[in-house]
Amino acid sequence: MAQPYPPAQYPPPPQNGIPAEYAPPPPHPTQDYSGQTPVPTEHGMTLYTPAQTHPEQPGSEASTQPIAGTQTVPQTDEAAQTDSQPLHPSDPTEKQQPKRLHVSNIPFRFRDPDLRQMFGQFGKILDVEIIFNERGSKGFGFVTFETSSDADRAREKLNGTIVEGRKIEVNNATARVMTNKKTGNPYTNGWKLNPVVGAVYGPEFYAVTGFPYPTTGTAVAYRGAHLRGRGRAVYNTFRAAPPPPPIPTYGAVVYQDGFYGAEIYGGYAAYRYAQPAAAAAAYSDSYGRVYAAADPYHHTIGPAATYSIGTM
């Protein structure tokens, strides 16, 4: 049992904040540890001296090493399988993605069921589309397979085959590159302020008195549409029409051009020299004002109330 130690003797607290001198503490009694202290046997503890060695049990290490070896080997295999598991499912996932094929040079009589029947033997098809315009089939289309592996097999088998005398081509469909188009339009209603373009694309917008613009029929059908070169029919329609008779106040003379002014719009020369009968009763100055010959003051006090100005 532990021996009780006497309490240490400390001096009384200092008076008036002046520390007092501490006396050295009494020495603690030392205990001799050279011998062994008897311990009650009911605790079941045994003390060993440093010179005594532990008895080695034969076969303890041999039995421990195989157990440790058998435990570490399965852990290594499981770790390797865990690392390799994310790599294997990635390949089937890529193969399961849909893939679209571009089929060109197909017969013009082919429709969607015909194209589906041709490619359906290689796998499940999600979508079939043949491109048409107003005249019919354009000779190409698209086939979308559920898996890319089926699409690759169909492309290898059908590319270059002859179908009704036409060699079809099957390739992987690629996304179309979209260019940035200018959306700003400085003109009203999308019409350009040009006489020829206006007559072709918007004849009713540039209509002038005395000019037979085709505002119905073919022109109305193409109004506001993307013509893509189809305006020749409209242009030829009003080009083939006979020129209108000249108007005395040259209302039809809008563009005094050497070509259009003489052929289409009547021209200023037709007004000046093709009216001998009208010139006898009335004459006009260079500004298009027509004065009556009976007015005695037409040349002194200005134009009379009977003059008219040509419509523009």
UniProtKB/Swiss-Prot annotation:
Modified residues (Omega-N-methylarginine): 223
Site (Interaction with RNA) location in chain: 100, 108-109, 133, 138, 142, 166, 176
Region feature Disordered, mapped onto this chain: 1-104
Keywords: Cytoplasm, Methylation, mRNA processing, mRNA splicing, Nucleus, RNA-binding
Cellular location(s): Nucleus; Cytoplasm
UniProt feature, compositional bias: Pro residues: 1-29
Gene3D superfamilies the UniProt entry points to: 3.30.70.330
Function, in words: Pre-mRNA alternative splicing regulator. Regulates alternative splicing of RBFOX2 to enhance the production of mRNA species that are targeted for nonsense-mediated decay (NMD).
Protein's name according to its UniProt entry: RNA binding protein fox-1 homolog 3
Organism: Homo sapiens (Human)
The encoding gene: RBFOX3
